[in-house]
């Protein structure tokens, strides 16, 4: 292409900057045309930089380096502009090329400048003599690979440790001094304005202590700064922090690994962190104030598509709030690009696909518009033009008929972004129509609680709110107000605590009178528990609906309230209606849990993740239960399925970490008995399990015993997140005297009584087998277990002998659960649940040989119907006894939710049910 063809390039006709550059450098137009034929890759940038540096002699001088980098920048800028204006490059290509340009410039400049300095002072070395490298952390859009075409670059310089250089033409200097000199020279090479322009403006203000801090900092200094002074806005900034220097050398790899270990816990909290909502809201308001101040000073810059309402920054904030809140628990949020964050938020159900698409389209439109504004004069501007000619050119470059059409589209996007931003960040804390201090709640939760002389007035106020025992409620409020926990809260947490306390008291009149006092007292128990974790107070402040649900749970169930107080991270579950309402999908649940475990930081974190995942699903089941959307049977089904899923994933993760493992997957299975086996699990039920293995390896017994011990530890150890399950292994062959894990063939012989008479199953063990099933682990062993179970249960038995042994076992159970009260124990007393279960087990063991349908583990009520079908009881009796069992289970379930350890009721409440069950027992066993 010749100069006469330069006008054919869209970039030269649109960009005043490129037109001037092409006039000063005739070969530029030809280079732009050649490069614009295809996307400009990192390899192309490196190759072109080699050519340009070779023109300046070897080794290239600093001046030659500056010239080459500036020429490369002009060519890349032109190629990107040409492809973009021609509609051949999308936003990702434009920002990717500019990011590659910045990284290539930084890495090449650093290598050449470091070599010069090392010739003078020697290589930088750490305390043990190891070579050290300067790490350049790209922040902001550089870190996110989202660099715009006229952006400055935000950098932070870090190095591994203090030390001294080895000495060269001059004597040694400190490592800190060496890297400071290197950093200063790098900044000069990139940002100094020469006759050829500049490469990138460099902004170092994000480093520790900003302009007043040292130019470079060691990792030790950075870690101390994060720990002592790190602020919320710096967490936000470091989300996009990324090393943009080379990663191949040993020094660079060490630095990257250590930097990640320091930054990750600073940015991503282990627990859900809702406190960042207020922090980002405050930061956004500061930015808006600065934007308004600039607009006042420069009215022509007032319409800012980056900092204005509905602009780029609001999209970035809307995405990154998810990272700060959830990135500690969900590694999928630890990504830099804004659109990748939105994709993960949508995949996680935190925003709808419609919202993700709307924000994505707005972001891409705004970034494209931003680039059009910047191509014009290579200016770092985000302001819409006021000059009519500039407006017309801008609209035409984007394919709009006129500027009004462009503004119409822009306003549509900005309105959508603004609405989504406000939905997340609008300050809901002060939304009441009246001042809290003027309300009854404000008068109660106040300094008056510290004044004994105010008790009478406070009791009267509490009575106005409808409390049955206002004096007792006052005593609890005073205890909290005067406690060291409350007094020691940081100011921001105390303000939030007070707001939630006011709201809880204001809500009292709307709470069921029978539970009002207890509900509010439990709420303050919860507030005391979460007070030290400002994030949970922030959640309750930011989301009033969450507090309403908390009060609903606390009022409806004592057990559920205690569960929430023990596991306050479950507060987050109250925000997600979609997750609560979504169908239970256990394969998807396990896959998501596996991904989170794979990204976890060690075994302790994995154990916490398992507990959090289990607790969240238990709580979801509880919320559906309290809403009347699950029957007692369905609650038990879901809890049992959840336990199976947790066991399956835990078996996998524990095996993967077992040093002794001799195969990729264990030939090992967990077999469920009791409530888990019968799918009648309650919220706080133990898991009755046995462990089987089937592995010919000579080390198998030792390996699986070690594995089982480790598995039990993972399931039962109390971590900061609580325990996963209580496990009962006494139903294994020979009970507590037996082996922890049992070989499958040995289990078969034990159950079929083929071995030593002293080592065979008792009748009660065969009773237990009627409710047993495969739960988790190797499905092949599960199928083999079921075959053994069928063989055992279909073995012919003597009716009289079987009846006698079952009656004797029933007496032992009764003796083991004495009831000295006048209330009826729904499970263990005569006429209760155990009588029904033993009768069903008797029929299964006696008649399964003739009626194999009876061995199906379908639950006691379904088995009663099977028994009636075979003529062993009438349909009427089956319905009556089945209804009694269902009534007992509902009552037991309700009492457990109310926090009762033993499920006992007034005898007259279940008189008819007891009579029906007693009649059944007498008919079957004659006793």
Curated annotation (Swiss-Prot):
This entry carries the following GO cellular component terms, namely: cytosol
Which UniProt key words apply to this protein? ATP-binding, Magnesium, Multifunctional enzyme, Nucleotide-binding, Nucleotidyltransferase, Transferase
Q: Name one GO molecular function term.
A: [glutamine synthetase]-adenylyl-L-tyrosine phosphorylase activity
Query: Which InterPro entries does the protein's record reference?
Result: GlnE (IPR023057), GlnE_rpt_dom (IPR005190), NT_sf (IPR043519), PII_UdlTrfase/GS_AdlTrfase (IPR013546)
GO BP, sorted A to Z: regulation of glutamine family amino acid metabolic process
Chain positions covered by the region annotation Adenylyl removase: 1-428
Q: Which domain of life is it from?
A: Bacteria
- The residue stretches assigned to a coiled coil in this entry are none
Q: Where is this region: Adenylyl transferase?
A: 438-927
Q: Which cofactors are required for activity? A: Mg(2+)
EC number assigned by the record: 2.7.7.89, 2.7.7.42
Query: Enzyme group, top EC level?
Result: transferase
Catalytic activity line of the entry: [glutamine synthetase]-O(4)-(5'-adenylyl)-L-tyrosine + phosphate = [glutamine synthetase]-L-tyrosine + ADP; [glutamine synthetase]-L-tyrosine + ATP = [glutamine synthetase]-O(4)-(5'-adenylyl)-L-tyrosine + diphosphate
Query: HAMAP family annotated for this entry?
Result: GlnE
Q: Record's family?
A: Belongs to the GlnE family.
PANTHER family associated with the record: BIFUNCTIONAL GLUTAMINE SYNTHETASE ADENYLYLTRANSFERASE_ADENYLYL-REMOVING ENZYME, GLUTAMINE SYNTHETASE ADENYLYLTRANSFERASE
Record's function text = Involved in the regulation of glutamine synthetase GlnA, a key enzyme in the process to assimilate ammonia. When cellular nitrogen levels are high, the C-terminal adenylyl transferase (AT) inactivates GlnA by covalent transfer of an adenylyl group from ATP to specific tyrosine residue of GlnA, thus reducing its activity. Conversely, when nitrogen levels are low, the N-terminal adenylyl removase (AR) activates GlnA by removing the adenylyl group by phosphorolysis, increasing its activity.
User: Could you tell me what this protein is called?
Assistant: Bifunctional glutamine synthetase adenylyltransferase/adenylyl-removing enzyme
């Amino acid at each position: 292409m010749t100069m006469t063809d330069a006008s054919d390039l869209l970039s030269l006709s649109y960009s005043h900057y490129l037109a001037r550059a092409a006039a000063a450098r005739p070969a530029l137009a030809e280079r732009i045309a050649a490069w614009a034929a295809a996307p400009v890759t990192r390899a192309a940038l490196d190759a072109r930089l080699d050519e340009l540096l070779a023109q300046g002699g070897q080794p290239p001088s600093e001046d030659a380096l500056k010239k080459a980098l500036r020429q490369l920048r002009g060519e890349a800028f032109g190629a990107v502009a040409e492809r973009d204006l021609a509609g051949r490059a999308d936003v990702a290509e434009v920002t990717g090329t500019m990011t590659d340009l910045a990284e290539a410039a930084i890495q090449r400049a650093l290598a050449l400048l470091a070599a010069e300095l090392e010739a003078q002072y020697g290589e930088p070395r750490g305390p043990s003599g190891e070579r050290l490298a300067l790490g350049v952390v790209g922040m902001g859009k550089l870190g996110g690979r989202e660099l715009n075409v006229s952006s400055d670059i935000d950098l932070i310089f870090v190095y591994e440790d203090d030390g001294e250089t080895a000495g060269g033409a001059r004597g040694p200097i400190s490592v800190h001094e060496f890297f400071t000199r290197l950093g200063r020279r790098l900044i000069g090479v990139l940002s100094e304005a020469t006759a050829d322009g500049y490469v990138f403006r460099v902004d170092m203000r994000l480093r520790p202590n900003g302009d007043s801090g040292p130019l470079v900092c060691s990792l030790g200094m950075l870690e101390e700064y994060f720990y002592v002074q790190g602020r919320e806005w710096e967490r936000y900034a470091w989300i996009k922090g990324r090393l943009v220097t080379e990663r191949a050398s040993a020094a660079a790899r060490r630095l990257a690994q250590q930097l990640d270990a320091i930054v990750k816990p600073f940015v991503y909290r282990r627990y859900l962190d809702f406190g960042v909502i207020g922090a980002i809201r405050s930061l956004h308001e500061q930015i808006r104030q600065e934007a308004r101040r600039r607009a006042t000073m420069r009215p022509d810059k007032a319409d800012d598509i980056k900092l204005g309402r509905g602009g780029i920054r609001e999209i970035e904030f809307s995405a990154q709030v998810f990272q700060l809140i959830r990135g500690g628990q969900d590694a999928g949020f630890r990504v830099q690009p804004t659109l990748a964050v939105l994709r993960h938020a949508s995949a996680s159900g935190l925003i709808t696909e419609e919202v993700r698409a709307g924000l994505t389209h707005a972001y891409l439109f705004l970034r494209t518009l931003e680039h059009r504004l910047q191509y014009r004069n290579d200016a770092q501007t985000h302001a819409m033009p006021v000059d009519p000619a500039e407006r017309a050119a801008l609209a035409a470059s984007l394919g709009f008929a006129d500027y009004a059409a462009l503004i119409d589209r822009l306003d549509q996007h900005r309105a959508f972004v603004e609405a989504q931003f406000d939905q997340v960040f609008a300050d809901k804390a002060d939304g009441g129509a009246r001042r809290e201090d003027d309300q009854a709640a404000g008068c109660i939760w106040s300094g008056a609680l510290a004044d004994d002389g105010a008790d009478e007035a406070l009791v009267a106020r509490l009575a106005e709110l409808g409390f049955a025992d206002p004096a007792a409620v006052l005593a609890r409020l005073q205890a909290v107000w005067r406690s060291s926990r409350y007094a020691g809260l940081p100011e921001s947490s105390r303000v939030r605590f007070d707001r939630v306390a006011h709201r809880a008291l204001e809500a009292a009149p709307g709470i069921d009178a029978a539970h009002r006092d207890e509900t509010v007292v439990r709420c303050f128990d919860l507030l005391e528990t979460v007070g030290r974790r400002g994030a949970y107070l922030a959640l309750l402040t930011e989301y009033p609906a969450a507090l309403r649900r908390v009060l609903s749970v606390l009022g409806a169930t004592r057990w559920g309230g205690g569960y929430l107080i023990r596991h306050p991270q479950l507060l987050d579950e109250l925000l997600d209606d979609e997750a609560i309402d979504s169908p239970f999908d256990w394969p998807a649940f396990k896959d998501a849990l596996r991904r989170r475990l794979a990204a976890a930081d060690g075994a302790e974190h994995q154990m916490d993740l398992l507990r959090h995942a289990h607790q969240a699903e238990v709580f979801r089941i509880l919320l559906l239960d309290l809403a009347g959307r699950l029957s007692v049977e369905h609650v038990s089904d879901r809890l049992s399925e959840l336990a199976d899923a947790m066991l399956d994933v835990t078996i996998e993760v524990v095996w993967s970490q077992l040093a002794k493992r001799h195969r990729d997957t264990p030939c090992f299975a967990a077999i469920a008995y009791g409530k888990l086996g019968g799918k009648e699990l309650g919220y706080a039920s133990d898991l009755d399990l046995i462990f089987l293995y089937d592995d010919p390896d000579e080390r198998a017994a030792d390996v699986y015993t070690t594995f089982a011990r480790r598995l039990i530890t993972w399931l039962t150890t109390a971590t900061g997140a609580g325990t996963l399950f209580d496990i009962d292994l006494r139903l294994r062959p020979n009970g507590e005297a037996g082996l922890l894990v049992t070989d499958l063939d040995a289990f078969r012989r034990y159950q079929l009584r083929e071995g030593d008479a002293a080592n065979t199953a008792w009748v009660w063990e065969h009773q237990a087998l009627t409710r047993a099933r495969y739960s988790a682990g190797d499905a092949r062993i599960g199928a083999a277990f079921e075959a053994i179970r069928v063989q055992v249960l279909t073995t012919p038995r003597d009716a009289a002998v079987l009846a006698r042994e079952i009656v004797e076992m029933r007496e032992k159970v009764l003796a083991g659960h004495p009831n000295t009260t006048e209330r009826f124990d729904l499970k263990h007393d005569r006429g209760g649940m155990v009588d029904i279960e033993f009768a069903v087990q008797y029929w299964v063991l006696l008649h399964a040989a003739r009626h194999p349908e009876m061995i199906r583990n379908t639950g006691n009520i379904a088995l009663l119907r099977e028994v009636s079908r075979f003529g062993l009881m009438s349909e009427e009796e089956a319905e009556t006894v089945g209804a009694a069992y269902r009534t007992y289970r509902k009552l037991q379930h309700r009492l457990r939710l109310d926090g009762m350890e033993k499920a006992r009721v007034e005898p007259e409440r279940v008189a008819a049910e007891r009579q029906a069950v007693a009649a059944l027992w007498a008919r079957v066993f004659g006793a």
